[in-house]
Design a protein with these regions (language model features):
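Active-site acidic/histidine proton-transfer and metal-coordination neighborhood
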Residues: 18-19, 55-64, 76-175, 185-187
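Histidine-acidic metal/acid-base catalytic patches
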Residues: 1-5, 10-30, 156-178, 182-271
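Transmembrane beta-strand segments of Gram-negative outer membrane beta-barrel proteins
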Residues: 1-4, 60-66
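Short, solvent-exposed loop/turn segments at secondary-structure boundaries
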Residues: 43-47, 78-84, 119-124, 188-189, ...
Length: 271
Protein backbone atom coordinates (compact mmCIF):
# COMPACT_ATOMS: atom_id res chain seq x y z
CA UNK A 1 0.00 0.00 0.00
CA UNK A 2 1.21 3.50 -0.80
CA UNK A 3 2.49 5.79 1.93
CA UNK A 4 1.25 9.35 1.56
CA UNK A 5 2.64 12.40 3.31
CA UNK A 6 0.31 14.94 4.89
CA UNK A 7 0.75 18.71 4.93
CA UNK A 8 1.08 20.24 8.39
CA UNK A 9 -1.72 22.75 7.73
CA UNK A 10 -4.17 19.89 7.12
CA UNK A 11 -3.88 18.78 10.75
CA UNK A 12 -5.57 20.29 13.81
CA UNK A 13 -3.34 22.96 15.34
CA UNK A 14 -1.87 22.07 18.70
CA UNK A 15 1.04 23.11 20.89
CA UNK A 16 1.44 19.42 21.70
CA UNK A 17 3.58 18.27 18.77
CA UNK A 18 3.39 14.65 19.95
CA UNK A 19 -0.37 14.87 19.48
CA UNK A 20 0.01 16.35 15.99
CA UNK A 21 2.22 13.52 14.80
CA UNK A 22 0.10 10.88 16.51
CA UNK A 23 -2.97 12.28 14.76
CA UNK A 24 -1.21 11.99 11.41
CA UNK A 25 -0.28 8.39 12.19
CA UNK A 26 -3.80 7.46 13.29
CA UNK A 27 -5.14 8.93 10.04
CA UNK A 28 -2.91 6.52 8.12
CA UNK A 29 -0.11 8.85 7.04
CA UNK A 30 3.53 7.85 7.39
CA UNK A 31 5.21 11.05 6.26
CA UNK A 32 4.85 14.67 7.24
CA UNK A 33 5.29 17.93 5.36
CA UNK A 34 6.45 20.81 7.53
CA UNK A 35 5.08 24.24 6.61
CA UNK A 36 7.57 27.09 6.35
CA UNK A 37 5.76 30.28 5.40
CA UNK A 38 6.56 33.88 6.35
CA UNK A 39 4.84 33.41 9.73
CA UNK A 40 6.97 30.38 10.61
CA UNK A 41 10.43 31.74 9.82
CA UNK A 42 11.28 31.72 13.54
CA UNK A 43 11.57 27.94 13.27
CA UNK A 44 14.99 28.48 11.73
CA UNK A 45 16.08 29.77 15.15
CA UNK A 46 14.76 26.86 17.17
CA UNK A 47 16.91 25.66 20.04
CA UNK A 48 18.28 22.13 20.12
CA UNK A 49 15.55 21.30 22.62
CA UNK A 50 12.79 22.49 20.28
CA UNK A 51 14.23 20.54 17.36
CA UNK A 52 14.57 17.46 19.55
CA UNK A 53 10.89 17.69 20.55
CA UNK A 54 9.84 17.47 16.90
CA UNK A 55 12.28 14.69 16.11
CA UNK A 56 11.16 12.71 19.16
CA UNK A 57 7.51 13.11 18.14
CA UNK A 58 8.39 11.90 14.66
CA UNK A 59 10.20 8.83 15.97
CA UNK A 60 7.52 8.00 18.54
CA UNK A 61 4.73 8.18 15.96
CA UNK A 62 6.57 6.53 13.07
CA UNK A 63 5.74 9.55 10.89
CA UNK A 64 8.84 10.85 9.11
CA UNK A 65 9.36 14.58 8.55
CA UNK A 66 10.02 14.17 4.85
CA UNK A 67 9.41 17.48 3.08
CA UNK A 68 9.81 21.16 3.90
CA UNK A 69 7.17 23.26 2.13
CA UNK A 70 9.10 26.51 1.73
CA UNK A 71 6.26 28.85 0.78
CA UNK A 72 7.92 31.89 2.38
CA UNK A 73 9.34 32.79 -1.02
CA UNK A 74 5.88 33.90 -2.10
CA UNK A 75 6.50 37.06 -0.07
CA UNK A 76 10.25 37.04 -0.70
CA UNK A 77 10.81 35.91 -4.31
CA UNK A 78 14.29 35.60 -5.79
CA UNK A 79 13.42 37.59 -8.89
CA UNK A 80 11.88 40.60 -7.18
CA UNK A 81 12.74 44.08 -8.45
CA UNK A 82 13.57 45.02 -4.84
CA UNK A 83 17.11 44.28 -3.66
CA UNK A 84 16.09 43.90 -0.01
CA UNK A 85 13.47 41.29 -0.95
CA UNK A 86 16.02 39.33 -2.99
CA UNK A 87 18.50 39.47 -0.11
CA UNK A 88 15.87 38.06 2.25
CA UNK A 89 15.05 35.32 -0.29
CA UNK A 90 18.67 34.15 -0.26
CA UNK A 91 18.80 34.25 3.54
CA UNK A 92 15.66 32.13 3.76
CA UNK A 93 17.06 29.52 1.38
CA UNK A 94 20.36 29.31 3.23
CA UNK A 95 18.56 28.88 6.55
CA UNK A 96 16.13 26.36 5.06
CA UNK A 97 18.88 24.10 3.75
CA UNK A 98 20.73 24.18 7.06
CA UNK A 99 17.50 23.54 8.98
CA UNK A 100 16.47 20.64 6.73
CA UNK A 101 19.88 19.00 7.10
CA UNK A 102 19.74 19.28 10.89
CA UNK A 103 16.19 17.87 11.01
CA UNK A 104 16.88 15.03 8.58
CA UNK A 105 14.35 16.38 6.08
CA UNK A 106 14.86 14.85 2.62
CA UNK A 107 13.40 17.50 0.31
CA UNK A 108 12.71 21.22 0.19
CA UNK A 109 9.79 22.28 -1.96
CA UNK A 110 10.77 25.53 -3.69
CA UNK A 111 7.92 27.88 -4.60
CA UNK A 112 8.15 28.85 -8.26
CA UNK A 113 7.54 32.56 -7.89
CA UNK A 114 9.68 34.95 -9.90
CA UNK A 115 8.42 38.18 -8.36
CA UNK A 116 5.96 39.70 -5.93
CA UNK A 117 2.31 39.54 -6.92
CA UNK A 118 2.33 43.33 -7.32
CA UNK A 119 5.37 43.31 -9.63
CA UNK A 120 5.65 42.74 -13.36
CA UNK A 121 7.59 39.60 -14.29
CA UNK A 122 10.40 40.44 -16.71
CA UNK A 123 13.30 38.58 -18.31
CA UNK A 124 15.46 39.92 -15.48
CA UNK A 125 13.07 38.35 -12.96
CA UNK A 126 13.58 34.96 -14.56
CA UNK A 127 17.35 35.42 -14.81
CA UNK A 128 17.58 36.32 -11.14
CA UNK A 129 15.53 33.25 -10.21
CA UNK A 130 17.83 30.98 -12.21
CA UNK A 131 20.91 32.58 -10.63
CA UNK A 132 19.38 31.90 -7.24
CA UNK A 133 18.77 28.25 -8.14
CA UNK A 134 22.45 27.88 -9.07
CA UNK A 135 23.31 29.15 -5.60
CA UNK A 136 20.64 27.05 -3.88
CA UNK A 137 21.74 23.87 -5.65
CA UNK A 138 25.26 24.40 -4.36
CA UNK A 139 23.99 24.78 -0.82
CA UNK A 140 21.76 21.72 -1.15
CA UNK A 141 24.56 19.59 -2.56
CA UNK A 142 26.88 20.39 0.33
CA UNK A 143 24.10 19.61 2.82
CA UNK A 144 22.78 16.51 1.05
CA UNK A 145 19.23 17.87 0.73
CA UNK A 146 17.14 17.68 -2.46
CA UNK A 147 15.40 20.74 -3.90
CA UNK A 148 12.22 20.43 -5.96
CA UNK A 149 10.66 23.40 -7.76
CA UNK A 150 6.87 23.51 -7.52
CA UNK A 151 4.65 24.87 -10.30
CA UNK A 152 2.39 27.52 -8.87
CA UNK A 153 -0.77 29.54 -9.54
CA UNK A 154 1.36 32.16 -11.34
CA UNK A 155 4.90 32.73 -12.69
CA UNK A 156 6.24 29.17 -12.98
CA UNK A 157 3.10 27.28 -14.00
CA UNK A 158 4.33 24.55 -16.35
CA UNK A 159 6.79 21.68 -16.21
CA UNK A 160 8.39 23.00 -19.40
CA UNK A 161 9.38 26.12 -17.48
CA UNK A 162 10.79 24.02 -14.67
CA UNK A 163 12.63 21.79 -17.11
CA UNK A 164 14.39 24.80 -18.62
CA UNK A 165 15.58 25.88 -15.17
CA UNK A 166 16.58 22.40 -14.02
CA UNK A 167 18.55 21.70 -17.19
CA UNK A 168 20.26 25.09 -17.12
CA UNK A 169 21.35 24.68 -13.50
CA UNK A 170 22.30 21.06 -14.26
CA UNK A 171 22.63 19.88 -10.67
CA UNK A 172 21.60 16.50 -9.25
CA UNK A 173 20.28 18.44 -6.25
CA UNK A 174 17.72 20.57 -8.12
CA UNK A 175 14.71 18.82 -9.64
CA UNK A 176 10.92 19.19 -9.97
CA UNK A 177 8.08 18.86 -7.49
CA UNK A 178 4.96 18.94 -9.71
CA UNK A 179 1.64 20.05 -8.28
CA UNK A 180 -0.94 18.12 -10.31
CA UNK A 181 -3.73 20.39 -9.12
CA UNK A 182 -2.03 23.50 -10.45
CA UNK A 183 -1.19 21.74 -13.71
CA UNK A 184 -4.84 20.81 -14.18
CA UNK A 185 -6.17 24.25 -13.24
CA UNK A 186 -3.97 25.78 -15.95
CA UNK A 187 -5.28 23.21 -18.47
CA UNK A 188 -1.93 21.62 -19.28
CA UNK A 189 -1.75 18.08 -20.63
CA UNK A 190 -1.04 16.39 -17.30
CA UNK A 191 -0.20 12.98 -18.76
CA UNK A 192 2.28 14.39 -21.25
CA UNK A 193 3.81 16.80 -18.74
CA UNK A 194 4.48 14.08 -16.17
CA UNK A 195 5.65 11.41 -18.60
CA UNK A 196 8.08 13.69 -20.42
CA UNK A 197 9.69 14.91 -17.20
CA UNK A 198 9.61 11.74 -15.12
CA UNK A 199 13.40 11.65 -14.63
CA UNK A 200 13.38 15.12 -13.06
CA UNK A 201 10.63 14.48 -10.49
CA UNK A 202 11.50 14.06 -6.79
CA UNK A 203 7.99 14.46 -5.36
CA UNK A 204 4.36 14.87 -6.37
CA UNK A 205 1.92 17.33 -4.83
CA UNK A 206 -1.61 15.88 -4.66
CA UNK A 207 -4.30 18.55 -4.60
CA UNK A 208 -7.65 18.96 -6.32
CA UNK A 209 -8.48 22.22 -8.09
CA UNK A 210 -10.97 23.92 -10.36
CA UNK A 211 -10.37 26.50 -13.04
CA UNK A 212 -9.16 29.61 -11.21
CA UNK A 213 -9.47 27.90 -7.80
CA UNK A 214 -6.14 26.60 -6.51
CA UNK A 215 -6.94 25.81 -2.89
CA UNK A 216 -9.50 24.15 -0.66
CA UNK A 217 -11.24 22.05 -3.31
CA UNK A 218 -12.24 18.72 -1.69
CA UNK A 219 -10.78 15.66 -3.37
CA UNK A 220 -13.14 14.33 -6.01
CA UNK A 221 -14.96 17.64 -6.46
CA UNK A 222 -12.42 19.26 -8.77
CA UNK A 223 -11.07 18.70 -12.27
CA UNK A 224 -7.94 16.66 -11.51
CA UNK A 225 -8.01 13.17 -13.05
CA UNK A 226 -6.17 11.35 -10.28
CA UNK A 227 -6.54 7.93 -11.89
CA UNK A 228 -4.72 9.32 -14.92
CA UNK A 229 -2.09 10.93 -12.69
CA UNK A 230 -1.31 7.71 -10.83
CA UNK A 231 -1.38 5.44 -13.90
CA UNK A 232 0.87 7.81 -15.85
CA UNK A 233 3.40 8.02 -13.04
CA UNK A 234 3.44 4.30 -12.31
CA UNK A 235 3.64 3.35 -16.00
CA UNK A 236 6.54 5.79 -16.39
CA UNK A 237 8.43 4.12 -13.57
CA UNK A 238 7.87 6.66 -10.81
CA UNK A 239 8.14 5.14 -7.34
CA UNK A 240 8.71 8.31 -5.36
CA UNK A 241 6.98 10.43 -2.78
CA UNK A 242 3.39 11.74 -2.79
CA UNK A 243 2.36 14.63 -0.55
CA UNK A 244 -1.29 15.45 0.17
CA UNK A 245 -2.01 19.19 0.38
CA UNK A 246 -5.05 20.25 2.38
CA UNK A 247 -6.01 22.95 4.89
CA UNK A 248 -7.93 22.16 8.09
CA UNK A 249 -9.17 25.76 8.64
CA UNK A 250 -9.92 24.79 12.26
CA UNK A 251 -12.62 22.38 11.12
CA UNK A 252 -14.00 20.21 13.92
CA UNK A 253 -13.86 17.13 11.68
CA UNK A 254 -10.48 17.79 10.06
CA UNK A 255 -9.10 14.42 11.18
CA UNK A 256 -11.96 12.58 9.52
CA UNK A 257 -11.46 14.70 6.39
CA UNK A 258 -7.80 13.71 6.01
CA UNK A 259 -8.67 10.06 6.69
CA UNK A 260 -11.29 10.10 3.96
CA UNK A 261 -8.94 11.94 1.59
CA UNK A 262 -6.32 9.22 1.97
CA UNK A 263 -8.93 6.50 1.49
CA UNK A 264 -10.28 8.22 -1.63
CA UNK A 265 -6.82 8.73 -3.14
CA UNK A 266 -5.93 5.08 -2.61
CA UNK A 267 -9.06 4.14 -4.56
CA UNK A 268 -7.71 6.14 -7.51
CA UNK A 269 -4.46 4.18 -7.69
CA UNK A 270 -4.09 1.21 -10.07
CA UNK A 271 -5.46 -1.90 -8.40
Amino acid sequence: MMDFGIYEKALPQSRDIEKVFQTAAEAGYRRFEMALDKDRLERFRWSKKEKAEWLRASLNSGVQIYNLVLSAHREFPFGSHKADVRKKAYEIMEEAVEFAAEMGIRTIQVAGYYALDSEEVTEDSEKRFIEAMHHAAGLAGRAGVMLGIENMDRDIISLDQMKKIVEEVNSPWLKMYPDVGNLSAHHFNVKQSLAENIHHIVGIRLKDTKEGVYRRVPFGEGIVDFKLVFSTLFNSGYRGYFGVEMWNDNSENSVEIIKEARKWLLQQTPQ
